[in-house]
Each structure stands twice: as structure tokens, then as C-alpha cells.
Amino acid sequence: MAFDSKKPTAQMLGRWQPWHDGHTALFKKALAETGQVCIMVRDVGGIVGEDAGGGRTASQDDNPFRFNEVRQNIVDGLAKHGYHEGMEYVIMQVPNIVDISYGRSVGYTFTQHDLGKEVHDISATKIRAEMRRSGILDFMGS
């Protein structure tokens, strides 16, 4: 069945620099909540950490992948598990969101999934370092 924007949808917001098995595990949990997921990609490609005020940073220090690369990494990663863009999920680029504010019950929840130590130990920082060491990713980007 095709993605239906009117149906209840789980949201995943992140940098996805790069998409990895931990993100896929989170996607599966989110998908189980509603049957479809909107993956939002923060517009941080190429940005080096900046002050966003209030002790937050607008981005972390290492964002080598641009939106089109992130999108393709997500599509490729989820295809390995039988998921298809436009069916179980959609991907959209969003501004560099650093805060989500709300005033009262607004009809949705925030859910933090415990994915276990093995998944939580997956590090995109270490993945990027290995990609650079092996020559897949240069130090100026991808």
C-alpha cells in the first residue's frame, strides 16, 4: 500500500550522517507504531558546528553528506530490508531544527525507544572515521 499522508505517521528527525544499522533498527520500531514513517533529514550537509543558543549547537562538527547522498543512503539501507520509499516511508529535507517546542497536549507523543546496548553502541562518528581511513570519504566531505 502507498504512503498516505492522512494516516497516522511516525516521525524520525535526524542528520543521518551516515544512515546505519542503528537507524534501521529505530525505523523498524517507528514503523511498528503506525505502519508508516516520515524520515526528516536536517539540512546540515557541509556545516561545521555553530552556536544555536541555549547551549545547543546548530549541528555537530561533522556533516560531510549532502541531502541527496543522505536520501540515497537511507533508500539503499532500507531496501536491503524490503522497505520502499513511497510505500512504508517518505523522506523530506527540513530546516536545521535544534528545538521542538509545544505548549500542551497536541495530539502526538514523543517516544524514545530502547534499542539495546548493541544498537546504541553503533557510532556514526566511528563509521565516518573508518570511511575516511579507507578512502571512501575524504576529509572535505564525501
Q: Which role fits each region the language model picked out?
A:
Residues 1-142:
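Nucleotidyltransferase catalytic core that binds NTPs
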